[in-house]
Amino acid sequence: MRETATFTVPSGFDRYQNPIDPTVYKVSCVHLQADNSTHKTAQNTEVTLRGVLFVDGRYSIPQLDYEALQEAAQAAGGVISCTVTGRRGSTIGPFDVVVVDGLPDDEANLHHWELGLV
């Protein structure tokens, strides 16, 4: 988990569909894994993911509530955008976050987030 992810959460859009005053979060200690699987979103649509981003519940900094961020982005009429910077400085993306899953540990605490990216 040595990559860094930059998330952009829109608060609204102008008439040209450019984000207005987006909030940007930079999260360290994440891991991007390539993927080519089909998943159902919260809106019950099927999407083919390009990757899954793993965000640790303990070591990734800062700790964010990705479900709340996704709800805020959807309320603004958009989705969370994400780019990932690798250990050597290479940037991958941009991706759109379409699936947000918080997975618990054995004691029902948050273990990690899995973010499905397209």
Model-flagged regions — what are they?
Residues 1-26:
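Active-site-proximal polar cores
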Residues 18-118:
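Short, conserved turn/kink motifs that form compact alpha/beta structural patches or helix kinks used as
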